[in-house]
Amino acid sequence: MDAKTVALAGGSGFIGRAIVRRLLASGQTTVRVLTRNPEEARARLDLPGVEFVRAEIGRPASLKDALAGANTIIDAIQFDGYPVENPRRGLTFERIDYAGAVALIDAAKQAGLQQFIYISGAAADENATHPGFRAKGRAERAIRESGLAYTIFRPSLVYGPEDKVVNGLARVLRFAPVFGVPGSGRQKVQPVLVDDLAACVMLAVSGRGRNGTYEIGGPDLMTFDEMMRIIMDASGHRRPLFHIPEGIMRAVGWLLEKLPKPMLSRDAVTFVTADNACDIKPLLDEFGINLTPARIGMAYLAKKQK
């Protein structure tokens, strides 16, 4: 891979940090992290070879300046509290996922960048009723129609040493006598190790998968219940599972939506109970990567936590 300067929006987040490390490991890339708070981002990702630049999606001039001299922009932004929106703080899928992508597209074109890489989601669909799936689908369309070379990744549930979902589930299992599964527990999920996603992003920076959209999940398609049993086996904390009806969860979400910093919402219930399956064959054909089986990845994760 020729030496490049890669700008990364969302570089201090869980997925972004893994991408930064993978790009630096290539030895062929200078990484520039776009962030509202460079000091805070540096504290979370203090690695040699990373440049931190102040930029905000609501300030177009700051984005253009931050992208000057870069070759590629990677959009891996997720808002705080994802997937629970907080409209009072402007943390919505429409503003962050869709409008944020459009702002980065405009800035990239003004700054003369040639390549846009987007971390979308497995259920992205511009016609979806869920605001998150719809916003990501609309962002994808904007990217495809931008005239920039692009690669779009649609991951299923992403996990790793620093994720909040799988690690959070493991922490609950450590102390709770039983575990409440959202919905029926039959919703499909295909957990993908964050390092595998980051490896594909690095290959995309070098030109692989150009102008393509690729779903990415692990090699194992499973139900949420089955994933919980794998997490329990890996952590050594087996607990009885019970299922929380969606109707009850939505009622609780409706109440919590009224709080200044809601921990649950009705849309978040839809998000966690939706199928999150992937067709990974196009990705495997194009990128030739060996995806990590869930039992191996989660056993590795459990060891990292000890």
Describe the predicted segments one by one.
Residues 39-111, 122-125:
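NAD(P)H-binding glycine-rich loop region in Rossmannoid oxidoreductase-like domains
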Residues 9, 34, 76-77, 116-122, ...:
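SDR active-site strand-loop-helix element
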Residues 100, 164-165, 184-205, 211-212:
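Substrate-positioning beta->alpha
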Residues 2, 200, 204-264, 278-306:
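Mid/C-terminal beta-alpha module of Rossmann-like enzyme folds, strongest
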Residues 28-36:
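Conserved glycine-rich Rossmann-like NAD(P)H-binding loop of the short-chain dehydrogenase/reductase
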Residues 14-18, 98, 137:
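Residues forming the Rossmann-fold NAD(P)(H) cofactor-binding site
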Residues 4-26:
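N-terminal Rossmann NAD(P)H-binding glycine-rich loop of SDR-like oxidoreductase domains
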Residues 120, 141-164:
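Conserved beta-loop-beta element that borders a ligand/cofactor-binding pocket
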